[in-house]
Design a protein with these regions (language model features):
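Acidic/aromatic/glycine-rich contiguous surface patches that form carbohydrate-binding/processing clefts
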Residues: 170
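Extended intrinsically disordered or low-complexity regions, especially N/C-terminal cytosolic tails and loops
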Residues: 1-162, 174-181
Length: 181
């Protein structure tokens, strides 16, 4: 009913988000076919649960990439945790500077930064890397040592990052799902 639709839009969602799902329905003579507002509500609800699930998965993937990279660096006799930071700064200066500045300006971990001065180990720096920056570090390490355990992170990392960002920013995922082309 119209009343239920208004209540839903006032309390649960907003028109722009819900109306995006109409793209999943065919148009005939400029009018959507077999479209009922409840269908939009159902798709919005499913989309929300899908986003929440995928966000949890993507966050876990990011975490396990950090864990694996940290493990590899720690157990690598050719790495001291500082040299790779210098290499990262040279190879990816924009990413390094962004992370360094985020670390330096962090009001929550300022003590950690001040304690280290200019000698920042990779384990401390990784705590302040965004996902894209982390993937550049993975790429650097992978190109140097070729550990098979990072192969999927190198190959699929950007896909996971894009999906994580779409979910975290509450983007509509289930749009144009039923296209024939």
């Amino acid at each position: 009913s119209k009343g239920k639709a208004i209540t839903f839009l006032e309390k649960n969602n907003y028109y722009y988000k819900v109306s995006a799902f109409r793209k999943n329905f065919k148009k005939k003579n400029g009018k959507y076919q077999h479209l009922d507002f409840q269908h939009l509500v159902d798709l919005a609800t499913i989309d929300m649960y899908l986003r929440d699930t995928l966000l949890d998965i993507a966050i876990n993937v990011e975490h396990f990439i950090k864990v694996e990279l940290s493990r590899l660096i720690t157990n690598n006799p050719d790495e001291d945790g500082y040299t790779i930071v210098q290499e990262f700064a040279v190879n990816y200066p924009t990413y390094y500077n962004s992370t360094y500045n985020r670390f330096r300006q962090s009001r929550y971990q300022k003590d950690m930064f001040l304690k280290r001065g200019s000698e920042i180990p990779i384990w401390a720096l990784m705590e302040h890397m965004d996902y894209g920056c982390l993937l550049k570090l993975v790429e650097l390490y992978f190109d140097k040592y070729r550990p098979s355990s990072l192969q999927k992170a190198v190959t699929l990392g950007d896909n996971s990052r894009h999906l994580r960002n779409a979910c975290a920013h509450n983007n509509v995922l289930m749009v144009n799902v039923f296209r024939d082309d």
